[in-house]
Amino acid sequence: MNDLLDPIRGIPVDLELVRRELDVDLPTARYLVRTGLITTDGARVLRRGPTTGTCATAAAKAAAIRLLEGRTVRTVRVRLPVGTVIGVRISRVGGDPSEARVRKPGSDDHVDVTTGVTIAARVEETGSEGVEIRAGRGVGETPSGKPAISEAVREQIVDNLRYLVDSYGVGLRVTIEVPDGEEIARKTLAHRHGIEGGISILGTKGLVDPNSEEAIEGSIRSDLRYVERVPCLVTGYRTMDRARRLGIPSRDIVNCHGRYDLALEAVKTGVPADGEVKRFDAVLIFGMPGKLLKLAAGAYNTHAKVADARRESLVTRLVEIGRPDLAVEAARHEGLISEFLRSLDPDVRRELFERVCELVEERVSSDHDLECGCALYFRADDSEEVVEGEGWKRLVRGYDDDLIGRPKG
């Protein structure tokens, strides 16, 4: 068997291609693929790098080992949210309180201003139990005043420090810092999301996917080769996981990274597979409000550098459902779009999301001559909402009845 499943994308990776292109033996190729550090997009082998969250976790673990065991480590093993374990190199350990630093590696084809940035963690004992996580200089602050450290990263740090906390019976305070964070943040789009004072510490899966246009298009076309029924376009790992929980098979889920233009063109024109051209006449789109508001407005490339019509689309959609009063509030709202959406009455929010799904289905069907089903995923406080368009309901029923989605030869 020359294929292993990519733990991030859930599709086969050609081990022989990896071994040949990287000039490594087969066990090394297996390790690189199993950890998620290496993936492929057709004939190309691509390297993933750790997220800011994984680097922060590695720094915290190295600092905690020095504090509790008196050892200085140069590499630490970090468990990723996806479940695999990778080694991360530590650039410096020392200080009082104990501090460690990681210089963030990059990934192939990924234009990322955080590549090469230093991420530091200070660790101190506390009188309480568990792990307390704080933000220091260079880590941004959200409009609500909270540190811009995602929940997934917080869970990753706690998961990787748990054995030390349990073994030594202590509580730990971890402070994450990015010495050049404020300067780097000026080069990012953080301010558009209301993040001030530094960068966000993020990472849903723990590894950064390559995302140049060439790499994204290659990844989309590679994923489409394995689709058995209807391609379900998602925009990231959060929507990918949620789509799986809705019952969409992993092989049918395609991460388009917000590039609906590239994905829909590939779905329509087809991709080479087993000596034939695999085409589809239907597509599912599953996303969160930010991306789908843009898509409803006709922005098929939803990257923030290209299109940021979320607020305008939100205002228009509210008018369309007969709530001009809320449209005015949305136009004046200075915080995050997600915060405004959480403030809405649940019934109004559902009506709004149904309208967004309806527009996406109509637009994609009209512009690309594809039967389209759209569903929207939203997290409101501690609960989750999934709103399905009529096209989605029809196509997913067909899934169950084995009526639709078979690729056309």
Curated annotation (Swiss-Prot):
> In which pathway is this protein known to take part?
Cofactor biosynthesis; adenosylcobalamin biosynthesis; cob(II)yrinate a,c-diamide from sirohydrochlorin (anaerobic route): step 6/10
Substrates-to-products reaction catalysed? Co-precorrin-5B + S-adenosyl-L-methionine = Co-precorrin-6A + S-adenosyl-L-homocysteine
Q: Name one GO molecular function term.
A: cobalt-precorrin-5B C1-methyltransferase activity
- List the EC numbers from the record: 2.1.1.195
What is a single Pfam family found in this protein's UniProt entry? CbiD
- Which domain of life does the UniProt lineage start with? Archaea
Q: Carries keyword Methyltransferase?
A: yes
Name the family: Belongs to the CbiD family.
NCBIfam families reported in the protein's UniProt record: cbiD (TIGR00312)
Query: What is the protein's given name?
Result: Cobalt-precorrin-5B C(1)-methyltransferase
Organism (species): Methanopyrus kandleri (strain AV19 / DSM 6324 / JCM 9639 / NBRC 100938)
Q: Point out the gene that encodes the protein.
A: cbiD
